Design a protein with these regions (language model features):
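Conserved N-terminal catalytic/coupling substructures associated with nucleotide/phosphate chemistry
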Residues: 1-127
Length: 127
């Protein structure tokens, strides 16, 4: 995804004000969500994968709040992706809009041969 595509996706989110089976929205205004594992495994276990957009507050009428620190959140997303089995390799994109910074993580769907993708800390059956 390019920065322009992320900006288009932000506009789409403002129009629809909803998530979909391949789109998850996280505020991340004050820090990176600490447990992305369910979302990461859910998207990795779908053929088409999915996208997580950070910087939109779903609980506040989809307010565009931006992220606290684009460099740090990318590192923390990657750290959580490395705790998955198989390791999730997100495509990260950063875009600016209205003086705020937004980050998206595209999570590719895993091949059937390596599924299920799961959180290593919980194990194959519960992660």
């Amino acid at each position: 995804m390019t920065s322009d595509e992320l900006l288009e996706l932000l506009n789409y989110i403002q129009k629809t004000k909803c998530e979909t089976k391949n789109l998850e929205i996280k505020a991340a205004e004050y820090g990176c969500p600490t447990k992305l594992y369910d979302t990461l495994s859910g998207f990795a276990n779908q053929d088409e994968g999915g996208r997580i957009v950070f910087g939109v507050d779903e609980k506040n009428d989809y307010r565009e709040c931006g992220v606290y620190d684009p460099q740090d959140i990318q590192q923390k997303i990657n750290d959580q992706c490395h705790q998955m089995e198989p390791v999730v390799r997100p495509l990260l994109t950063v875009a600016e809009k209205g003086g705020k910074t937004f980050v998206s993580a595209e999570i590719p769907g895993d091949d059937l041969a390596v599924r299920p993708c799961f959180y290593q800390g919980a194990g194959r059956l519960t992660g």
